Amino acid sequence: LIDKNLLSKIIKRKIKINSVLDLHGCKVNESKTRVVNFIKNNYEMNNRLILIITGKGKRLGVENGWKGKGVLKEVIPQCLNSVLLSRFIIWFDFAPKNMGGEGAILVYLKKTIK
């Protein structure tokens, strides 16, 4: 779990996002591979706060409101919860609206052990 003070600082953008991964246009398998590499690389560089942009899904009729179903926004949280990646992660959740909302995931990584 994440400290409420830290979460407040993240939401208010008082803590800088160290790195961003944009998965727009990627297939599921490619996205999983890119996320694994992104998490591991940022952990090794001791980057703590990162953002993964999944997108919100295809728009199926904007005139009728949002009807998109994003495959990646369903799959990537499962990937982050995996045994392979969970050891690097303290916390993750969908980003606040001012950072992409449900089309992006904020991830707070553990400190690198040296």
Regions found by a protein language model. Name each.
Residues L1-L49, I53-K114:
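Long, charged, low-complexity intrinsically disordered regions
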